[in-house]
Amino acid sequence: MAVGKNKRLSKGKKGLKKRTVDPFTRKDEYLVKAPTTFQVRDVGKTLVNRTTGLKNANDYLKGRVFEVSLADLQKDEAHSFRKVKLRVDEVQGKNCLTNFHGLDFTSDKLRSLVRKWQTLIEANVTVKTTDDYLVRLFAIAFTKRRPNQIKKTTYAQSSQIRAIRKKMTEIIQRQASSCTLTQLTKLVPEVIGREIEKSTQGIYPLQNVHIRKVKLLKSPKFDLGALLALHGEASTDDKGQKVEREFKEKVLESV
């Protein structure tokens, strides 16, 4: 029998000398700040690896997208089915300054709206705001019973659907093209839907009219001054205030 060192016995000891390092010791916390258009500014915290050498933490933070419930941002449970996307555009100290990046409905809300015996009408419009943001808005609406209607179903004819869709497109185009992205985020939750509902009463009564989705297609060249103004540097008095713009029907003086 040959006498020598058993190599297999020494291999297992090498792994015992390794010291495990907690990866969170190399990370820093940054605060995520929402624009002043929302009542609640503090969205939450995010983690990122600490700046080391040529790897800058700010570069990893810029471009991050956070999804937040609009009910939490506006302190209103009526908006609990709306989700707002916020994108980090700039990092100031330990604060991540965000801008509006999109809006969507929760899947359970969308599924609860779709029912039998009614017609679903959808429309989408691509429009440019006054501050050169290219956005696409998706609208959704459902027919409802007329007053004193006995018939169970509320199906609209194809011509009525086309007329309603045309009206929806015109209203969205007019509202979105005449305001900034900040103003649009205030109009989207309720104002545009109410105006569409009132404008289409003569064609077919509608219910559950909403802008279900806002998609940001293209942003203008980054402007730090505009972003800082959006986060409290401007001297506007409408910070975090709800928009209550009522739709006024046109009255014909002569027939």
Swiss-Prot record:
Matching entries from Pfam families are given as: Ribosomal_S3Ae
> Annotated Gene Ontology MF terms?
structural constituent of ribosome
Q: PROSITE patterns recorded for this chain?
A: RIBOSOMAL_S3AE (PS01191)
GO CC entries: cytosolic small ribosomal subunit
- Which biological processes are named by the entry's GO terms? translation
Q: What is its main location?
A: cytoplasm
Q: Which domain of life is it from?
A: Eukaryota
Q: Which UniProt keywords apply?
A: Acetylation, Cytoplasm, Ribonucleoprotein, Ribosomal protein
Where does this polypeptide localize? Answer: Cytoplasm
N-acetylalanine PTM positions? A2
Q: Which InterPro entries match?
A: Ribosomal_eS1, Ribosomal_eS1_CS, Ribosomal_eS1_euk
Which SMART domains does this chain map to? Ribosomal_S3Ae
Q: Which HAMAP family match?
A: Ribosomal_eS1_euk (MF_03122)
Complexes and interactors: Component of the small ribosomal subunit. Mature ribosomes consist of a small (40S) and a large (60S) subunit. The 40S subunit contains about 33 different proteins and 1 molecule of RNA (18S). The 60S subunit contains about 49 different proteins and 3 molecules of RNA (25S, 5.8S and 5S).
**UniProt family annotation:** Belongs to the eukaryotic ribosomal protein eS1 family.
What this protein is called in its record is: Small ribosomal subunit protein eS1
